[in-house]
Amino acid sequence: MKKKRTLQNNLSYALKYMFGNYGINIFLDSKKFIVTLDNLIPNLQEETNLVKFAIQKNAISAIVNAYDQRDIDKNFAYLRAKTILTKNGVSEKATTYLLDCFLYAFDWID
């Protein structure tokens, strides 16, 4: 039987919850963002560590700063974030997963 996805066991749901309840500003304050994320998904340490690494390398800020921009700028931000992460040793699979979680949270994808 497949494990049911809930807020507590799914990064994309947690990010979407944060965006829906706190808006884009929660992602601009990295300390508040990480504390909130740790509280929402305490059992997803691997995902949380990946988010922290992406914040440290400014990959997340590339996506966040493009939030209210044109689609072309969003696409550029996605590619920039992807390049940052892969050049810093994050696998293609993990990079795609992480960025897709943020895109889902921001309603850029379904």
Named regions from a protein language model:
Residues 1-110:
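Charged, amphipathic alpha-helical regulatory modules used
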